[in-house]
């Protein structure tokens, strides 16, 4: 299927693919963060930390072979926390011009004047910081056109619809390819940044057998285009997940070993990570409050990558 889209949007997107190298942008953002921190110091902050990020990219969605949306987006923002003694003030903005950034710092300082003194406030100790962070290989830009994105959506959706006659409808397919950067700095002299990309394909379909209907989805996501699953295989996986739900049966009460799928298991461990997070413990909102040294999982539990 051949798809068309507004020439103005296409021109805007293609221009974005040939902007200054992202590493040059990171250098400029580092300078901006440094200026923000210096301004906070001049206004009386005893410590400060700031993060600035930006993201741009393409998103496409289709449904039943028709293009629903084609979007090019470009977003950015800065957040800063300042500390005046043990008083903390925070502010943020999506407007990154220098005048606005200075104003945001001033607002954060003003907020700090009205917050409670808290001895736990402050930035991380200098000796805990990594001043030479490793390159985690997060940046793999993809010069992909909207037409390619549309074709990938169609391939995923059509593969799902053709997989089985019980797949009767689609909730659509989507494709996205984004790149961006993040820079963090604080008053200990740390200013570091990195570029990042994220590409994804997904689809959701509806299955029917008798009077029973179910829906499910599948997706693939990767920093690197080469790490994405084939679009058709994403569609087949969505169909298989949907069909597996049809005529599902409830289990009786029993005590048995359970193997959780990866997409479910990570949420279970997510609850543990949230419960032992410093913020939850500080607010006394964790079920593991005052549980240091307590055995939480069975000694026979183990995590395996399969």
Positions of PLM-derived features:
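Active-site bordering "gate/hinge" segments
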Residues: 6-306
């Amino acid at each position: 299927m051949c798809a068309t889209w507004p020439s103005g949007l296409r021109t805007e997107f293609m221009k974005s693919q040939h902007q200054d190298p992202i590493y040059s942008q990171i250098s400029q953002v580092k300078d901006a963060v440094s200026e923000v921190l210096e301004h906070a110091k001049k206004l009386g902050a005893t410590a400060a930390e700031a993060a600035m990020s930006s993201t741009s990219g393409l998103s496409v969605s289709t449904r039943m072979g028709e293009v629903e949306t084609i979007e090019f987006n470009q977003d950015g923002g800065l957040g800063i926390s300042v500390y005046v003694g043990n008083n903390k003030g925070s502010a943020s903005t999506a407007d990154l011009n220098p005048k606005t950034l200075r104003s945001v710092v001033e607002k954060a300082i003003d907020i700090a004047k009205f917050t409670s003194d808290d001895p736990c406030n402050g930035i991380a100790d200098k000796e805990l910081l990594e001043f030479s962070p490793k390159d985690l290989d997060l940046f793999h830009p993809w010069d992909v056109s909207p037409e390619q994105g549309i074709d990938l959506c169609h391939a995923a959706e059509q593969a799902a619809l053709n997989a089985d006659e019980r797949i009767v409808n689609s909730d659509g397919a989507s494709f996205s390819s984004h790149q961006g950067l993040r820079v963090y700095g604080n008053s200990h002299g740390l200013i570091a940044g990195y570029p990042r990309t994220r590409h994804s394909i997904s689809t959701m379909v509806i299955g029917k057998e008798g009077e029973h209907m179910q829906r499910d989805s599948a997706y693939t996501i990767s920093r690197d285009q080469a790490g994405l699953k084939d679009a058709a295989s994403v569609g087949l996986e969505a169909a298989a997940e949907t069909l597996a739900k049809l005529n599902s049966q409830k289990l009786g009460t029993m005590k048995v070993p359970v193997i959780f799928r990866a997409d479910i298991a990570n949420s279970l461990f997510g609850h543990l990570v949230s419960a032992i997070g410093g913020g939850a413990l500080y607010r006394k909102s964790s079920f593991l409050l005052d549980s240091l040294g307590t055995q939480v999982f069975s000694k026979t539990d183990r995590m395996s990558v399969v």
